[in-house]
């Protein structure tokens, strides 16, 4: 549990990625700290790119495993 709390940037990236893959707007970012918000947006951009390339559902499972371990 403590390890998750220490790495806020990786968690923000992961949550942003998941929001992007699910098609949510970047305006739905819940983070207010500038550095952490930027990581969320980076994850969101990568997630949106994967969504546009069709990496959702079963075809995106291999990519999702790499994102969620961070």
Curated annotation (Swiss-Prot):
Signal peptide: none annotated. Keywords: Cytoplasm, Translation regulation. One of its GO terms (biological process) is regulation of translation. It holds the Pfam family RMF. It comes from the Bacteria. InterPro entries: Ribosome_modulation_factor, RMF_sf. It is found in: Cytoplasm. Disulfide bonds: none annotated. One of its GO terms (cellular component) is cytoplasm. During stationary phase, converts 70S ribosomes to an inactive dimeric form (100S ribosomes). Belongs to the ribosome modulation factor family. This is Ribosome modulation factor. It comes from Marinobacter adhaerens (strain DSM 23420 / HP15). The gene is rmf.
């Amino acid at each position: 549990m403590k390890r998750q709390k220490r790495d806020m940037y990786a968690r923000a990236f992961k949550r942003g990625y998941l929001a992007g893959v699910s098609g949510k707007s970047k305006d739905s970012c819940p983070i207010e700290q500038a550095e952490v918000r930027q990581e969320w947006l980076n994850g969101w951009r990568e997630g949106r790119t994967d969504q546009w390339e069709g990496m959702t559902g079963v075809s995106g499972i291999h990519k999702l495993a790499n994102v969620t371990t961070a």
